[in-house]
Amino acid sequence: MQNINPTQTAAWSALEQHKADNLNIPQLFAEDANRFDKYHLNFEQQILVDFSKNAINQKTLELLRQLANECGLASATEAMFSGQKINRTENRAVLHTALRNRSNTPVLVDGKDVMPEVNAVLAKMKDFCERIISGSWKGYTGKAITDVINIGIGGSDLGPYMVTEALRPYKNHLNMHFVSNVDGTHIAEVLKKVNPETTLVLVASKTFTTQETMANALTAREWLLAAVKDESAVAKHFAALSTNAKEVAKFGIDTANMFEFWDWVGGRYSLWSAIGLSIALSLGFENFEALLSGAHAMDNHFRTAPIEKNIPTTLALIGIWNSNFLGAETEALLPYDQYLHRFAAYFQQGNMESNGKFVGRDGSPVTHQTGPIVWGEPGTNGQHAFYQLIHQGTKLIPCDFIAPAQTHNPVGDHHAKLLSNFFAQTEALAFGKSKETVEAEFVAAGKNLADVAEIVPFKVFTGNKPTNSILVQKITPFTLGALIAMYEHKIFVQGVIFNIYSFDQWGVELGKQLANRILPELQNAEKISSHDSSTNGLINQFKAWR
């Protein structure tokens, strides 16, 4: 990938000047009654992306596209898809796209096609899923599996948990449980719910050394052996999503039940790999394949659609406009679908771990904003929690509103009520409510304006708050796969333009190193003085209270 400082491009300078036009969303709609027609894109007639309620015009988009071209987006995209080692700090290719490459077109890393190995792992996953789901796989007392616990953290947990929740309508009879936190409460509460005779534990750790994951896995192992008192039972109740065959075997897991993935799969992009085994077990392998197919379709769109019609690129560019030029520091993901209740948390990791960097590809600190803070909750819950600040606060918070046109649960008029809020919120954020409108409402209600003059300012909404509306025909494995891939590619595009490396996560390491240094200090009652006064004080109080 090229090393291009975006702030030194002609497009960046032009965008800085263009910002002075102070585009206003209500005014843009007033000037063009058909604005929606020009500012939305459609993916396979299943996902509609409306970006008309942003403070942009054609000039904005032209300059943003020029910025993408000047920053080498096209060549960077081909570099990723073709297996070049674009993760320079770890000298790795970035090929989550190969995991869902349903066309089987060869993808080369160091001259070797990775697709045969990808397909071999998928075939192994399919066979394993069929045995567990059908009941032919038996536990140590000869009973079929009823419960599956996925033990992982970060990408080994967030993605599988998000997808299994999002696609709950497609679930089979297996009960799924996810354990991530090293807090013993998490594993303890899950183990209370399950029977060791009928439980399968998936241990998701590439190295099989991840501290949190292995602590939980060893606790689950002790729990099983407390019930059965036979080490051979471990092989009937544990499987590994890992590449460390030696440690897997040492744990007691049959390496025939070890599902591999590769160093070109980043953790936060790994749900498409063997890390997605919990998804396949929960939904059935055919639905896991449909998830892959949806992502592959979006990959093809991203790779081949011209920039004017390219959905992930358009969303990425508008995000850069909002954050780097209009001053937004956060982005809210607001799914109007309860099944998507972990979607924002998933892309909180996806975006913030990818683009939360302050060093450019040239090794120097950047002078521009990089990745935004990403957060969100399902609608309509958020409306009764934090929308107040979005509507009337002093922070600019661009929002993505996501909703399905068809619900899996057509209960009364619930879905119409839900979607009426979905449509109303973006309209309210864009157009607000003027002082004149507030006064007219008071008059219509029979109030004397003199009596309510003090209240009027508090009921004014300034509007001009940017939103994207993403309307999905129905949340299915295919459309969810496409939606996830859409956001993945958005993150990639922004990383290219920010001139950072999006596929490492060195920020995770320092805390781990310090925790490993502190852990032995907690094993005794001695007072600690080896840290700063704050850390010493906290550790010593912990020792006094435990």
Curated annotation (Swiss-Prot):
Its main location: cytoplasm. Keywords: Cytoplasm, Gluconeogenesis, Glycolysis, Isomerase. The keyword Cytoplasm applies. One of its GO terms (biological process) is glucose 6-phosphate metabolic process. GO terms for cellular component: cytosol. Its EC number is 5.3.1.9. It comes from the Bacteria. Pathway: Carbohydrate biosynthesis; gluconeogenesis; Carbohydrate degradation; glycolysis; D-glyceraldehyde 3-phosphate and glycerone phosphate from D-glucose: step 2/4. InterPro entries: G6P_Isomerase (IPR001672), G6P_Isomerase_C (IPR023096), Phosphoglucose_isomerase_CS (IPR018189), SIS_dom_sf (IPR046348), SIS_PGI_1 (IPR035476), SIS_PGI_2 (IPR035482). It catalyses: alpha-D-glucose 6-phosphate = beta-D-fructose 6-phosphate. Gene3D superfamilies: 1.10.1390.10, Glucose-6-phosphate isomerase like protein, domain 1. The keyword Isomerase applies. GO terms for molecular function: carbohydrate derivative binding; glucose-6-phosphate isomerase activity; monosaccharide binding. Catalyzes the reversible isomerization of glucose-6-phosphate to fructose-6-phosphate. Belongs to the GPI family. This is Glucose-6-phosphate isomerase. It comes from Actinobacillus pleuropneumoniae serotype 3 (strain JL03). The lineage of its organism: Bacteria, Pseudomonadati, Pseudomonadota, Gammaproteobacteria, Pasteurellales.
